[in-house]
Amino acid sequence: MIARKLGLLCFIGVALAFSQQLCAQVGETIPGPLLETRPENGTPIAASVQTNSIFSQPRGLTLSNSVVGGYNDNVNASTGASTSSTGGSGSLYTSDYASLSYTFGTPRTHVSLTTGGGVTYYFDRPEEGYNPAGYLGLSLTHKPSERMTLSLSVFASYQSQPDLSTNLGSNQQLGSFIHSTDTISLAYSWTPRFSTVTSYTLDLLNYFSSAGSLQNRMEHTFGEQFRYLLWPTTAGVAEYRYEIIDYESAPLDSTTHFLLAGLDHTFTPRLNGTFRGGVELRSSESNGFQASPYFQSALTYILHNGFVIWTNSYSIEESNTVGVSSAPAFRTGLTLNYGLTRRLSGNLALFYVYGGNQSGGTSSSSGNTIDISPSLRYLITRRLSANAGYHYTSVSGSQSQNNYFAGLSFSF
């Protein structure tokens, strides 16, 4: 009798551990932002859409408005090169943007919505003085049954400044563009140890200028994960993905098969990681057949007053340079939010890329891209805060930009 009870308790423990991992996947247990935004102009950091999916948002409605002033030393370099090489010049600017977040739900359904937008005015920009931007983020999870979880993630942004956190877009200033990433997935627990996750992701990139039109494309990714709970804190994963990339006009269409394996592991209640490795087999109009190793990892550490997210990947990426074919690239990103004191907090967003035809030219060319943005926020009152920071970008040593800013934010 005792042995039977112990066996039942062990079975329940394994089942609970497995269900907790599923909850973490749909973002129901850890508080945090749905996505990160740039404090100087309110534009979203696209890479945070996936990394922040483990977070949940406080229920209710939150509104905020920010007014920022700053100086950008290379605002007029439309070609993306440095000030000295292309005649680009600096400009004082001011930004005014607002954001709204709303979270609601039931025990079976959870919905989080965040949206925002604003305008940046450059005093010394000859033609385009006003620079509008806006974004929308939506996260929805629904459990039709105890075994099944349906998830939907929607992200779309309209902006003109390049977003170097992902490879969906140029690393040069090519005018206003729309970037969208939408994912729907179905997770089903067949047994207490075995589950599957079926997903579809649509990525869309559309520039409104003729200079950026060769980057316009749609990316369709179909995925199937087979998950097995090896231990209460570790799940083994076998994964297959099929990707179709369809360019609007450039002859760079491709199809790719991904054969991957990896682990999802909880090191401690505060530290968890995901790891994938394997091979990608690509057939493209420009390069023919390519076989390349693939690696992807993400570590999330929940601090007492914040969090750290570190991501890494090595894969074949679409080029950031107009009209240039794809090539392997290494990409790493670090996001840090930390409360230094009761009133003072610090943020850091760091992204680095090596390879991927960033410097243009032939398919073998490569370069280094770095994007770093530290900032501080000081809570003056419960609703009013001051922020200041610095944003630096450099692409292949030929393009650099320094952005200094400070402002006030009011939430209600």
Show where each model-derived region lies:
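Gram-negative and organellar
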Residues: A24-F412
